[in-house]
Amino acid sequence: GRGGASNYVRL
């Protein structure tokens, strides 16, 4: 989704 690092953390 939006945001680079934030998206990976949710994955």
From Swiss-Prot:
It comes from the Eukaryota. The keyword Translocase does not apply. The modification Leucine amide is found at residue 11. This is Extended FMRFamide-9. FMRFamides and FMRFamide-like peptides are neuropeptides. The lineage of its organism: Eukaryota, Metazoa, Ecdysozoa, Arthropoda, Hexapoda. Keywords: Amidation, Neuropeptide, Secreted. Belongs to the FARP (FMRF amide related peptide) family. It is found in: Secreted. GO terms for biological process: neuropeptide signaling pathway. It comes from Namaquaphasma ookiepense. One of its GO terms (cellular component) is extracellular region.
